[in-house]
Amino acid sequence: QEYNGISKKIRYQTDALRQCGADVRTCHYEVGNDGSRKWMIDEDVLADLGKGIPAKIKKRLSFAPILQYVRREGIQCVYIRSYHNANPFTIHFVRMLKKQGVRVLLEIPTYPYDHEYSSGMEKVQLYTDKLFRHAFCRYVDFIVTFSSDDRIFGRPTIRISNGIDFARIPLRSPRHGTSKELHLIGVAEIHFWHGFDRLLKGLGAYYGNNPEYKVY
């Protein structure tokens, strides 16, 4: 989904890697307007999983089409963006990648992440992840993180910064003066980790000093 913030970040990363000379293919899961579920490689269908509950189950259990593609194309490195879904099936997937001699990098966008789960279903997913994540990471060469941690789940890290592609999002041309006031706008899905509460708390502290400069 091009409007999705996560999808945009992935696009920025793949574009940056291509600019560095890497041959990058993006494997992702797609749900069509007709309810069909597919594994995709860029714009091409890798595997049609069908529709309904059987397709949902296949998505979580069967990674054979991806493994076959990696072997057929001679892929040397697989970069996985973590969905906190370590389980016996994803462990089997990364173990088979290692058997093929593939280097595996796992990006964990937010770490630690245990506190991010609040609903009942999310806690079940987190419990499963806690049970299996160390076993999963045994087959991971490096964990990519935005944090300052040297090691995560026993694996060495590669520390990067979370940025944007200015070629896709140009700097805004100023149209209004900011000498008297500043208007802020939040453009995102509103989840607690986006920090809107911290912004409001900061504004409250700011206005507690009766400032002349107004921020809205």
Explain the meaning of each model-derived region.
Residues 1-33, 73, 142, 198, ...:
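N-terminal subdomain of nucleotide-sugar transferases
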Residues 1-11, 82-87, 191-194:
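A short, glycine/small-residue-rich beta-strand->loop->alpha-helix junction that serves as a flexible
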Residues 149, 163:
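Carbohydrate-associated surface elements
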Residues 67-88, 101-105:
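Short N-terminal targeting/anchoring amphipathic segment
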